[in-house]
A protein has these predicted regions:
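Alpha-helical transmembrane bundle of multi-pass membrane proteins
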Residues: 1-227
């Protein structure tokens, strides 16, 4: 029942599930995907064709290919390590994007049609690293962990709550991303997302246990609950 999932004995897995669902979104993945065209335009890709091309390959292609990394290694090196390594890659790449936008803001004149600037190329490479890091970590691994930490009798409700929170966080990020860019600038916006990655890394390191290879009974033992 819904009452059971909020009982004290399931509080820890519920908080882990909700925390993972939130960090998956507030680290900026949907903001980057939704507004990739505007981001690349601001970075110096002046034509619609160039922006469409880099969006297709830098986001779509890399996202698909990197997901196979998670599939290949999730049962070999574990969920925690993939999450922690992915967040490092995401945080560093977002910090680099922020630094690139500082350089872009200090460069006089509009982007030229002759080609992207060095700062634009750095932005694309950093965002490729960001997308790849997300695709082998927070993207698929979050939902693997969420499905593993709940026992069968409350799993459906636990996953449903995590999904609702995830979509709520995605909505807020997508609604306020451009407003945040207007308010504090592109550089500080990406640095803020990098800070969220750092906070997420610390939280996962301290709070999220490894579930690789554990039976349902052993996972329940971690919560102090007898199956």
């Amino acid at each position: 029942s819904w009452v059971e999932i909020f009982s004290p004995k399931w509080r820890r897995p519920l908080l882990i599930a909700l925390g993972l669902a939130i960090f998956q979104q507030i680290t900026g993945i949907n903001a980057v995907i939704y507004y990739a065209n505007q981001i690349f335009a601001a970075a110096g890709f002046s034509t619609e064709v160039s922006r469409a091309t880099v969006t297709l390959w830098a986001i779509g292609g890399v996202n698909v290919l990197s997901t196979f990394i998670a599939i290949a290694f999730i049962d070999k090196i574990g969920r925690r390590l993939l999450l922690l390594v992915g967040l490092i890659g995401m945080g560093v790449s977002l910090a680099v994007v922020g630094a690139a936008f500082v350089f872009i803001a200090q460069t006089p004149g509009a982007p030229q049609a002759s080609g992207p600037t060095p700062a634009a190329i750095v932005t694309v490479v950093a965002l490729i690293v960001f997308i790849a890091s997300f695709a082998f970590s927070l993207g698929p691994v979050v939902w693997t962990v969420i499905n593993e930490i709940f026992p069968a009798q409350i799993r459906a409700r636990g996953v449903a709550l995590a999904t609702a929170v995830n979509w709520g966080a995605a909505f807020l990020v997508s609604q306020f991303f451009l407003s945040l860019v207007d308010l504090i600038g592109s550089a500080w916006t990406f640095w803020l997302l990098a800070v969220f990655c750092a906070v997420g890394w610390i939280w996962i390191f301290l709070r999220v246990p490894e579930t690789r290879g554990l039976s349902l009974e052993k996972i329940q033992d971690m919560w102090g609950v007898k199956p």
